[in-house]
Structure formats: structure tokens, C-alpha cells
Amino acid sequence: GCDTVFTTGGAQSNHAALTAACAARLGMKCILLLKRRGVTEHRGNLVLDELFGAEVRLLDMDSYDEIYAEMHRIGGTLEQAGHKCCYIPVGASTALGAVGYVSGAREIAVQAMAAGVRLGHIVSATGSGGTAAGLLLGAGLFLPGVKVTGIAVDSSPFDKIVPRLAGEAAALLECPFQPEENAFQMVEHMGPGYALPNPEDTPYIEELARTEGNVLLTTGAKELGAFA
């Protein structure tokens, strides 16, 4: 098995923080190659990453292709020293990564049925496409007629990425993937940039905190703000 795991994302990547947490639990070394863009202070998930024991490298690179090359360069040196490395792409947006959210869609279906709630839409912030892909496939399997809406919090061609990943996840699970017409749509609400708060969303963050006691992260605030 592997003893070292690499992944990447924005400086405040939730995926990166979760990877660091899982690596800590499994006793693996975790190396995070994160984009420095937008970092003005050491806060949020950067603190958690280091708390979990991850080695954090902030890179002045905007292209993930460049970051992947650096990832494999570092990993190659470690492998020559006898380590075994696992490389996870941004957001774990692969067929296997999407499968986790197929299971999530099933859980949503079970809970909705138990609560007697009839769903029409599932809304998810979309930063790399894996979550939306898994929900799209899962909705088709467990929630017929329910549409998936992705809120773009980064700039990528999600209208192509999400259906492709959903199809690859279906192939991995050996299940059919024939989405209904208009089963998936994207709404752009990135604001100033990935992980950067949109000032227009501040009233919704405050209202939810003061009426429900719930605190939204930047991505969650953009989900809510997109429909306000």
C-alpha cells in the first residue's frame, strides 16, 4: 500500500483538509500543494491542514497541470527513497471520487422519504465537478425526476466535466447512466474568485446565523446567494 498521499486545490480547499484528516487517521504522510492565490493571512483550512500534520506547500501557480507536474516531481524523489505515493487530483474529481456522492444521493433519498419530503432539486457548490457528478448519477438512480443544480465557485467547463465524470462513475459501478433532459444545470456565482467571499452574500450568512444558528462557509454562502 501507499504511505504518502498528495493532493491539491485552493488554499482553503475543504477536500485538501479532509485528505489531511484521513491521512492522519491512517498514519500516512500528507503533502498538500495548494494555490497561494488570494492568501493574505494564515487562517481557516490552512490552520486545520497543519493541525492534521500535513506538509503544506503554497505555490505561485495558476495551472493545475503545472501543479501536477510539481507533485509528481516531489513524489518521484520520495519513491526513489522507497516511499509509495498516491496522487489525488483537485477535489478528488475522478470516477471513484464521484461514487461517494452517489451514496450521498441515496442517503438524501432515504431521508427525504422518511421525512415525507418531495424533492425537486439538489443544489451543490461546484469547484471541480466530482460532487455534482456523483449527485447527478445518484439522483438518476434513487431520485427520479430530481434535477441537480451546480453553483460554480470556480471557472471550469462544468457543463462538460460533470456529465463526463458521472458517466465514468456509472461505468465503474456497472450501472446505467441515461440522464433525463435538463437533469443538470450550472449557475455561475463565483464572485471575486474561488474561496473569496462575495459581499452580496453577507446578508444571507448573517440571517442564517442569527435565525438558525448555522454558519455558512464561503461556498455555502454562494449556494444560497445564487438563488436569492
Q: Each PLM stretch: what is its role?
A:
Residues 1-228:
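PLP-dependent amino-acid enzyme catalytic core
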